[in-house]
Amino acid sequence: MNSSTSAGVYANGNDNKKFKGDRPPCSPSRVLHLRKIPCDVTEAEVISLGLPFGKVTNLLMLKGKSQAFLEMASEEAAVTMINYYTPVTPHLRSQPVYIQYSNHRELKTDNLPNQARAQAALQAVSAVQSGNLSLPGATANEGTLLPGQSPVLRIIIENLFYPVTLEVLHQIFSKFGTVLKIITFTKNNQFQALLQYADPVNAQYAKMALDGQNIYNACCTLRIDFSKLTSLNVKYNNDKSRDFTRLDLPTGDGQPSLEPPMAAAFGAPGIMSSPYAGAAGFAPAIAFPQAAGLSVPAVPGALGPLTLTSSAVSGRMAIPGASGMPGNSVLLVTNLNPDFITPHGLFILFGVYGDVHRVKIMFNKKENALVQMADASQAQLAMNHLSGQRLYGKVLRATLSKHQAVQLPREGQEDQGLTKDFSNSPLHRFKKPGSKNFQNIFPPSATLHLSNIPPSVTMDDLKNLFTEAGCSVKAFKFFQKDRKMALIQLGSVEEAIQALIELHNHDLGENHHLRVSFSKSTI
């Protein structure tokens, strides 16, 4: 055997000699060269690196050289894999692995010794891909490609602490194949999307790798299923829908993204909109400094953290100092009821969606206030959830302020206690990184989630507490497995908002202070 032939690659590891920087990178090939693989790694683990991107057709392990060659079924699959792993170094057994195109076009391993284990691993993977065998730990839905399976995925984003846009979804899901179309909408107070791949296999691998993963740390969880639809009909290219094969489509501002038959097939209302469409000052995609990236461990050892690169969000952050644009953490809150609103009340309410640092009610116009959040993303989240809600008989409006910070009054300046600094408050819900509170952020609703209830406090005690606060209690339920928590349903969303302001951190005795938040559930 000699390794000079360009048609195949043999067991001498010839590609390794080409890493000296004395030649340009190889052109795309379906054969990939892996270096620095751990000496005790298994064939299945190496195959798992390629599995999310398409069918793996051959494998050659050179354990003595800590190298391997992986052959994909198509050049397109290999290109997708390289594109994914270029910014994100894969790891096997906690050790970084380096991948590049081989200068060979295919693997020829028929007559080589010690190939039995590699072939057995390939056969096992082939059985999974053909639907005859499930992956260990995977359900039939995940591990097998069923006949006629749809290339369309239905995606639900839970715990939407930061805005997730069409561009962000495209960047994440493009790692697993060619994305043809995306439609985003809101249903049941949840941000959802339909995403169509060119091939059902791509949809299969994306679901396997991404279902249950977080886009950002401890929030924005992906829930992925196959759609009953087999294709999407996109009429407009805008921030809600996109057909990447038809760049000529109109923007269709204000038009529904789905045609009625498609909406009916999905069980969705006729008019669907992004939860952020029309929000004042909201740009289609924002890069958040807190975003540590999407972790994708579904294929053992294969995928490291996926950090959203600047390509999907370039030009979307506001210029520092620009007024009324994302990047500002100060909100202007208007149309408040001056007879009832206080800085503390605004601190408690806006604190549901982020850590409030300062609040200023305007001295000469007390129906207006400034609320400074910990960062721009929290300000955006609070604005999206609270603007338009009724509070003390008036419809609250929140927009991004032209101010970059709330100034404290100078010594001797008349203020009447209208400006408060809460930056060191013990009531901040999100001061701990990765706090579970990130996972329980929901829009205002008539049902409140109560927690930190001491054992001596009864259902009647809590119902009376809310009744005395002026609420009409419609239903109450302790959690079956944990009586420290309960749900209480009030007469309206406005009642619930006002009850949260008044009763969050209420002293229940026994060194227990009531914790109140909005619930996604009903009783």
From Swiss-Prot:
Q: Is GTP-binding among this UniProt entry's keywords?
A: no
Gene Ontology molecular function: RNA binding
Q: Does the keyword Ubl conjugation apply?
A: yes
Q: Mention one GO biological process in which this protein takes part, according to its record.
A: mRNA processing
- Modified residue Phosphoserine is at which positions? S425
Q: Where is this region: Disordered?
A: 1-25, 406-426
Any Gene Ontology CC annotation: nucleus
Cite the InterPro entries for this sequence.
HnRNP-L/PTB (IPR006536), Nucleotide-bd_a/b_plait_sf (IPR012677), PTBP1-like_RRM2 (IPR021790), RBD_domain_sf (IPR035979), ROD1_RRM1 (IPR034326), RRM_dom (IPR000504)
Phosphotyrosine found at: Y98
Sites where N6-acetyllysine occurs are at: K394
The covalently linked position for Glycyl lysine isopeptide (Lys-Gly) (interchain with G-Cter in SUMO2), per the record, is K36, K187
Q: Which UniProt keywords apply?
A: Acetylation, Differentiation, Erythrocyte maturation, Isopeptide bond, mRNA processing, mRNA splicing, Phosphoprotein, Repeat, Repressor, RNA-binding, Ubl conjugation
RRM domain span: 30-114, 153-229, 329-403, 446-521
Could you tell me which residues carry Phosphothreonine?
Answer: T109
Query: How does this chain assemble?
Result: Interacts with THBS4 (via the acidic amphipathic C-terminus).
**Physiological role:** RNA-binding protein that mediates pre-mRNA alternative splicing regulation. Plays a role in the regulation of cell proliferation, differentiation and migration. Positive regulator of EPO-dependent erythropoiesis. Participates in cell differentiation regulation by repressing tissue-specific exons. Promotes Fas exon 6 skipping. Binds RNA, preferentially to both poly(G) and poly(U).
Q: What is this protein called?
A: Polypyrimidine tract-binding protein 3
What organism is this sequence from? Mus musculus
